[in-house]
């Protein structure tokens, strides 16, 4: 039984702002359906009596010394930007646009 439809893949693609062809929609629907099938199989495993684990490597807050290092100036950083305005990176507006 299919768990994800072609329309759901198209909806996800719109949300992610991906332009997919008809063939890609069909292909991804099958791939995502297979992935969900594997996840379902893993979820069905009986883990009664198995102790929960997290990260077996107990490294906590491994940090480097907080030292001042040379970095780009604002002008140098903005020089590499496709568009800048008022000393900031200018990017296309995305909030408030339809899905």
UniProtKB/Swiss-Prot annotation:
Pfam families on file: GatC (PF02686)
GO biological process, one term: glutaminyl-tRNAGln biosynthesis via transamidation
Keywords from the named record: ATP-binding, Ligase, Nucleotide-binding, Protein biosynthesis
Xref: SUPFAM superfamilies: Glu-tRNAGln amidotransferase C subunit
EC number of this enzyme: 6.3.5.-
GO molecular function terms noted in the UniProt entry: asparaginyl-tRNA synthase (glutamine-hydrolyzing) activity; ATP binding; glutaminyl-tRNA synthase (glutamine-hydrolyzing) activity
Catalytic reaction equation(s): L-glutamyl-tRNA(Gln) + L-glutamine + ATP + H2O = L-glutaminyl-tRNA(Gln) + L-glutamate + ADP + phosphate + H(+); L-aspartyl-tRNA(Asn) + L-glutamine + ATP + H2O = L-asparaginyl-tRNA(Asn) + L-glutamate + ADP + phosphate + 2 H(+)
Enzyme's top EC category: ligase
InterPro entries reported in the protein's UniProt record: Asp/Glu-ADT_sf_sub_c, GatC
Keyword Magnesium tagged: no
Protein purpose: Allows the formation of correctly charged Asn-tRNA(Asn) or Gln-tRNA(Gln) through the transamidation of misacylated Asp-tRNA(Asn) or Glu-tRNA(Gln) in organisms which lack either or both of asparaginyl-tRNA or glutaminyl-tRNA synthetases. The reaction takes place in the presence of glutamine and ATP through an activated phospho-Asp-tRNA(Asn) or phospho-Glu-tRNA(Gln).
Quaternary structure and interacting proteins, as annotated: Heterotrimer of A, B and C subunits.
Family to which the UniProt record says this protein belongs: Belongs to the GatC family.
Protein name (database record): Aspartyl/glutamyl-tRNA(Asn/Gln) amidotransferase subunit C
């Amino acid at each position: 039984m299919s768990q994800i439809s072609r329309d759901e893949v198209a909806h996800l693609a719109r949300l992610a702002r991906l332009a997919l062809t008809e063939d890609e929609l069909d292909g991804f629907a099958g791939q995502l359906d297979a992935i969900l099938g594997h996840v379902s199989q893993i979820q069905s495993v009986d883990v009664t009596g198995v102790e929960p684990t997290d990260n077996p490597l107990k490294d906590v807050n491994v940090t480097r010394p907080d030292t001042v290092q040379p970095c780009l100036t604002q002008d140098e950083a903005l020089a590499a930007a496709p568009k800048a305005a008022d000393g900031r990176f200018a990017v296309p507006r995305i909030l408030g646009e339809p899905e």
